[in-house]
Amino acid sequence: MELLHSGKVRDVYADGGDLILVASDRISVYDVVLPTPIPDKGKLLTALSLWWFDQLAELVPNHVLSATDVPPEFAGRAIRCRRLDMVPVECVARGYLTGGGFAEYQRTGAVSGVELPRGLVEAAALPEPVFTPSTKAPVGEHDQPITFGGVVDRVGAETAERLRRITLDVYRRGAELAAGRGILIADTKIELGWAADGTLTVGDELLTSDSSRFWPVESYQPGRAQFSYDKQYVRDWATRSGWDKQSPAPELPGEVVDATRARYVDVYEKLTGKRWG
């Protein structure tokens, strides 16, 4: 196998005509990879992605060829995938106003050019989910919000419309399934690419704790920060630490590592109904 790319979290290998996508235990916040791994994180992301790919298979095609036909040293954290020509934008859907989206709304009254009602508070539910794309930055650089017009400039109007529709369809269906299991999906990012037959296909990961914000339904209360089953916990620690959000990043304390792993395990078990390990 040939290593083609080492990303913030995943390594991509070529194996004949297929790709082997390996999820590491690395974690990144603010587009910077932290030096401290989260044990089992790669396996948890892979298992949850596979569950979601199966749940949403009738809604949108995905890149999975096999979860078992992978090198033994990568068992549990790798997927054999079809090659995709990836779209050069990050496709983001938001159903709740939080994080960078809330900060942008406070400045402008909009998110990625989408005008929103006045007076919304932190974690407010939006009237309808919105498509808020961003650039796809290299490792070490920051993704930047772009408008729908910016997507049109990059991929054309027809493809931009399809990206928006698929992203919002995935979000709505995922949010519906998760709500029935006690989880709110505040927002999520998906990556799409063209398969060899010209089909727009979901790649990378799907509705995981790295790509989404997950909140417990039972404690949801707009107007404040929410308990989260995702890497928001690490983002919050990084902000409190005084780190300037530039590389190199500080080591994570042991208690932050343990609490982060516990969150990833909890949401996997709540969503899938399966016991981890």
Swiss-Prot record:
<keyword id="KW-0547">Nucleotide-binding</keyword>
<dbReference type="GO" id="GO:0005737">
    <property type="term" value="C:cytoplasm"/>
</dbReference>
<comment type="similarity">
    <text>Belongs to the SAICAR synthetase family.</text>
</comment>
<dbReference type="GO" id="GO:0005524">
    <property type="term" value="F:ATP binding"/>
</dbReference>
<comment type="pathway">
    <text>Purine metabolism; IMP biosynthesis via de novo pathway; 5-amino-1-(5-phospho-D-ribosyl)imidazole-4-carboxamide from 5-amino-1-(5-phospho-D-ribosyl)imidazole-4-carboxylate: step 1/2.</text>
</comment>
<protein>
    <recommendedName>
        <fullName>Phosphoribosylaminoimidazole-succinocarboxamide synthase</fullName>
        <ecNumber>6.3.2.6</ecNumber>
    </recommendedName>
</protein>
<dbReference type="InterPro" id="IPR001636">
    <property type="entry name" value="SAICAR_synth"/>
</dbReference>
<keyword id="KW-0658">Purine biosynthesis</keyword>
<keyword id="KW-0067">ATP-binding</keyword>
<keyword id="KW-0436">Ligase</keyword>
<dbReference type="Pfam" id="PF01259">
    <property type="entry name" value="SAICAR_synt"/>
</dbReference>
<dbReference type="GO" id="GO:0004639">
    <property type="term" value="F:phosphoribosylaminoimidazolesuccinocarboxamide synthase activity"/>
</dbReference>
<dbReference type="InterPro" id="IPR028923">
    <property type="entry name" value="SAICAR_synt/ADE2_N"/>
</dbReference>
<dbReference type="GO" id="GO:0006189">
    <property type="term" value="P:'de novo' IMP biosynthetic process"/>
</dbReference>
